[in-house]
Amino acid sequence: MKKNIINILIILCAVAPLFSCVKDQEFLEEAPKTIYTVDNAFSKSSQVDAQVARTYYAAYSLYVWIDGNIFGAFSGSPSSTLLGYGSDVIEGNAAIVNAGSAFSHFDNLDPLNGRFLSLWNALYQLASYANLAIYGADQVSWSSDAEKNDLVAQAKFFLAFSYLRLAECFGSVPLVEEFNQELRYDYVRTPRSEVYAFVIKNLEEAVAGLPNYPAQDGRVAKGAASHFLAEAYIAQGIETGDKSYFNKAVSAANATISLHPLMTERFGVRANPADKGTTGMFNIPNYREDGSPFFDLFQIGNYDRSEGNTESLWVMETPTYDQQAAANSGQSNNSIVGCAQPYRDLIWKDQYKETKAPGPWAAAARMDMAKYPFGSAGPYCGGGSWGMYGSNDYIDEYVWQGDFATDDRNSQAILIDPVVMDMDHSMYGQVISKDMLTEPARYMRVSGKVNLPDAWGFDSHCIIMGQGPQAMFGRDVYAARSAETYLLLAEAQWRNGNSDEAAKALNTVRVRAHCSKLFSASEVNMVTILDERARELSWEEHRWPTLLRLAKEGETNTVMHDQLRAHAQYVNDNPVYPGTAPKWSLFAIPLSVIQLNTGAEMPQNDGWK
C-alpha cells in the first residue's frame, strides 16, 4: 500500500504543471484520513453504538458525582443542581456552606452563578452527542434495520431528555434539531411549547423504536421512554392549557407501569430468611430482618431488571473497583464522594460534653468496631465522603409528621437517626436530637439511599487507605423507577379532574411502603403530590425540573414559591439567616450565553437583573 501511494504521488507531480492555478490550489488541499470530522467519523455501525454510549456517559453526570472532585459540588455540578441543591429538599451541608454561599439564599443569586452555566452546557452537550449519533446512523451500513432503529431510538430518547430538562429549567431555549459543527452567534429562543412539542415527537418515536426491555443493563427501553413522555405531556398540558395532554400522560404512564410493576415483596440480596445467622464481609449479617421491599431496592446487587427488579426503568451503572482500575490503567478509588451525609459535624452543647467523650463521636472516640467496622469512617458516617450535601428538615421531619410516621420509607433501616457512637459517653447508643447540639442546622437524618446502613456489600479493594469505604463506591443510581411513574400518573389524573384516580395512584405507592395513612380524593392537590414525591424520591428525583415546570412560562410559579418559602434551608430552616423566596419562576439564562450571542437577541428570564 505504501509503495502504491508513492507511485501515485510521482505521477501527480509529473502532470501537475498541466493544470491551472485553480487545479494547483485543489491539489494542495489535504484530506488526511487520520483526522476525524463529522464527514468521515462513521464508517461502521459499531462507531454509532460508541457514540450512543457516549450519550449514556453524559447522562450519568446528570445524576451522580463522578469526577471525585469534592469541590466540584460547589462550582456547580449539573447533577446536584438537578437533584435539588438549594430547593426544598437538599442544601449544602451547613458545616460547609453558610447563608452567603448557599443556593437557597435566593437574594444572592444572579445570572453569573456557575450552576446555571454548567447545567446549560451539560444539557446542550448531551443534545449534541445525541444529534451526532442520529447523523452517524445514516452514514453506515447495518446488519439489520432493527439494529439501526434501536440505536437511533436510544439517541432520540437522549435528544428529547436533554430538551425536556432545558425547557423545564430555562423555559424558551434555542432548539438545535440536527447536529451542527459551525460556530454560531445568532441563536434565538424557541418558545417553550415548541420545545416541548419537539421533545414529545422524539420520545414518541423512541417509544416506537425501543424494545420492551433493554438487552443490556443501563440501557433505556420502552418503559423509560414512556415514563419521560408522560412527564413531557404533563409539562405541555401546563404550558398550553390543553387538557388533552393529561389524557395522553395517563396512557403513557400506564404503558410504563404495565411493563414495570412495583416491587411489593422482599427480593434479592439480604432478603432471604434462609441466610439468617450467616455473615458476609466484615462479619455483617447477610439477612436484614428489619428490611422491606423499599429497603431492598437500594441494596448493592438489586438495582437492575436482570437482578430481579421489575420496578427499575433506567439505572446509572456505577463502575466497580476493577472496572475503574481498567479504565484508568491502574487502581482507583475515584467515584462518588460529594453527597454522603456525615455524623462528624454534630457538636454537643456544653451540658452533653463528657471528659472522655467530647462529641457524639470523634475520630479518636472509642467505638464498637464489631458493630461499626472502620469506626468514624464507616459508610453510616459518610465513609470517605466530605458530606457536601445535607437534607432539609422537609424530607427529614416535615413529611413524616402525624399520621405519616408509619411508613417503611421512614424506618430506621432506610432513614436513620444519628446515635451516640462513642462507647465512653453515658448516652451511648441513644438517638441524638437537635436540642442537644450547638448548631441544630447541622443535624440530618442519614438516608440509606446515599449512605449505607452498614458496610455490607463493599468491595474490600474500595477502602481508602487507613480509613473506611469510599462513600457509595460501586453503587448504582436510579434515573427512574416506576414508583415515580405512579406519581406522574397521579398528577396527570388530578390535573384532568380525576381526583379519585389520582388518590388511587398515590395510594398504590403508599401501600407498598406499608403506610398507615392513605389519601382520599379530597386530599389530593399539587402539594400533596410534591410531599409524596419527597417521601418516595428524596435524593433521586430531579427536583428542580419538577418545581420549575409547575407554571406556564411568563406566569408566577406560585406552587414553587410557596414550597420554597416553607421549606428551603435559608428561607425557613435556618432561623439565624432567614431569607426570602425567589422572585423568578425559571432559572436564569447564563449571562455569558447572552453576551456571546452577538448576532441575535437572547432575552433574560423574568425576575433576573
Regions found by a protein language model. Give the residues of each.
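C-terminal substrate/ligand-recognition segments
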Residues: 113, 371-509
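Short coil/turn linking the two alpha-helices of tandem helical-hairpin repeats
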Residues: 167-168, 172-174, 214, 235-242, ...
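Conserved, well-structured interaction surfaces
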Residues: 37, 43-51, 57-68, 89-170, ...
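Long, intrinsically disordered, low-complexity segments
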Residues: 20-22, 123, 198, 276-358, ...
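An aromatic- and glycine-enriched ligand-binding surface/loop that stacks and positions planar moieties
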Residues: 22-93, 240-429
